[in-house]
Amino acid sequence: METMLLHLHLVRHGQTFFNRYNRLQGWSNSPLTDAGLADADKAAAKLRDIEFAAAYCSDTTRAQVTAQRILDANEAAGHVRPSLVSDMHFREQFYGYFEGQDMSVAWTAAGGPHGAKNYNDIVRKYGLAATRDFLKEADPFHDAESDNEYWHRVEDGFALIADNPRLKDGDVELLY
């Protein structure tokens, strides 16, 4: 297998209603606020002059809207518009039982048994991976993704990019 160098631009969506309300959202499909739409347009303006060979995003509306706005601006600047691949492998972490719950309540439930008061305390004491593992432990149904489950899914998403036969060495891709 030939090794290729691809340039990947990672873009996060702007503010959603769940963000505004301090609610956990991973797989929940909370729409972008007006501020979030403005953030998408700012990202679009900054990326408009980059020629993208491919574009990928999660299958959530917030990611798709952000991606479409960036690709619209890119196309308006004279670039060929790549097809947008929306796939669940690019979703954010799944919070299981805690999806849509107030963040302070969820992170207290996850960190409390480990002597951590909140998300930042968990990260400081145990590292980022522990945030996923502790939340899965605290989920009464254990549906929330563990760190291992999360990375296994995301790696499958990166495999979709790597397996794209149209990409060549040096191409630039966009991931929302």
Predicted regions span which residues?
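Extreme N-terminal starter segment of soluble prokaryotic enzymes
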Residues: 2-9
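Phosphate-coordination/substrate-recognition cap region in phosphate-metabolizing enzymes
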Residues: 3, 44-126
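Short coil/turn segments at beta-strand junctions that form active-site/ligand-binding loops
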Residues: 6, 51-53, 166-172
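Histidine-centered catalytic micro-motifs
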Residues: 10-16, 176
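Loop-to-helix element that buttresses phosphate recognition and phosphoryl-transfer chemistry
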Residues: 15-70, 145-154
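Glycine-rich, flexible loop/turn motifs
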Residues: 20-23, 28, 86, 94, ...
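Active-site-adjacent alpha-helix immediately C-terminal to a catalytic or transition-state-stabilizing loop
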Residues: 64, 72, 155-176
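Short glycine/proline- and acidic residue-enriched helix-loop micro-motifs
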Residues: 113-149
